[in-house]
Each structure stands twice: as C-alpha cells, then as structure tokens.
C-alpha cells in the first residue's frame, strides 16, 4: 500500500471529512514521526509496533560495479519492530 492508497482508503471510510483534510493529516503524522526519529526518540504504537533507530557500525564495503573496497561510515537506520497483535494478524494470512 502506498501513501496515496492509504489516503484514498481513509478518505473513503470517512466520507464526512474532505479528502484534503485526510491527506494533510496523514502527511503531518508521517512528518511528525520522521522528526521524532530524527531527534533520536522511539515511537511506540500499541498493538501495531515500535519504530527506533539502530546504529550500523563503520565497515568496509565493495563497489558492485568495480569490485573496489569502499569505506562506509557508521550511521543510524530506522528500525521497525511489529507488535504482538500485528504479528498475530500477519500470521493468519501466511
């Protein structure tokens, strides 16, 4: 599901809200979540999961085209850990 598909579905389920208001709300929520992670904070949505940052240590990688070694810096990457309810629902369809 893409962001536009999510907005479309939410707007169709809430016909009393203008589609633009739903779009603005979704964009604002995602922007706030990104800013929270950028500040190094953890986000927990009960029943859904949690978002946090994990540190990737510096390492030596390879350029896939040339095969030459490339030094990669350490960095933080977003990490999502699904909650129990989400895992259980996903296993129904697996």
UniProtKB/Swiss-Prot annotation:
<dbReference type="GO" id="GO:0005694">
    <property type="term" value="C:chromosome"/>
</dbReference>
<keyword id="KW-0804">Transcription</keyword>
<keyword id="KW-0805">Transcription regulation</keyword>
<dbReference type="InterPro" id="IPR000119">
    <property type="entry name" value="Hist_DNA-bd"/>
</dbReference>
<dbReference type="InterPro" id="IPR010992">
    <property type="entry name" value="IHF-like_DNA-bd_dom_sf"/>
</dbReference>
<keyword id="KW-0238">DNA-binding</keyword>
<comment type="function">
    <text>This protein is one of the two subunits of integration host factor, a specific DNA-binding protein that functions in genetic recombination as well as in transcriptional and translational control.</text>
</comment>
<dbReference type="InterPro" id="IPR020816">
    <property type="entry name" value="Histone-like_DNA-bd_CS"/>
</dbReference>
<protein>
    <recommendedName>
        <fullName>Integration host factor subunit beta</fullName>
    </recommendedName>
</protein>
<dbReference type="GO" id="GO:0005829">
    <property type="term" value="C:cytosol"/>
</dbReference>
<dbReference type="InterPro" id="IPR005685">
    <property type="entry name" value="IHF_beta"/>
</dbReference>
<keyword id="KW-0233">DNA recombination</keyword>
<dbReference type="GO" id="GO:0006417">
    <property type="term" value="P:regulation of translation"/>
</dbReference>
<dbReference type="GO" id="GO:0006310">
    <property type="term" value="P:DNA recombination"/>
</dbReference>
<dbReference type="GO" id="GO:0003677">
    <property type="term" value="F:DNA binding"/>
</dbReference>
<comment type="subunit">
    <text>Heterodimer of an alpha and a beta chain.</text>
</comment>
<dbReference type="Pfam" id="PF00216">
    <property type="entry name" value="Bac_DNA_binding"/>
</dbReference>
<dbReference type="GO" id="GO:0030527">
    <property type="term" value="F:structural constituent of chromatin"/>
</dbReference>
<comment type="similarity">
    <text>Belongs to the bacterial histone-like protein family.</text>
</comment>
<keyword id="KW-0810">Translation regulation</keyword>
<dbReference type="GO" id="GO:0006355">
    <property type="term" value="P:regulation of DNA-templated transcription"/>
</dbReference>
């Amino acid at each position: 599901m893409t962001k536009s598909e999510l907005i479309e579905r939410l707007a169709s389920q809430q016909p009393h809200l203008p589609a633009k208001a739903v779009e603005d709300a979704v964009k604002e929520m995602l922007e706030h979540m990104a800013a929270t992670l950028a500040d190094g904070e953890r986000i927990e949505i009960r029943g859904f999961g949690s978002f946090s940052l994990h540190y990737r240590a510096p390492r030596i990688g390879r350029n896939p085209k040339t095969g030459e070694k490339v030094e990669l810096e350490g960095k933080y990457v977003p990490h999502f850990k699904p909650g129990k309810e989400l895992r259980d629902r996903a296993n129904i369809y697996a």
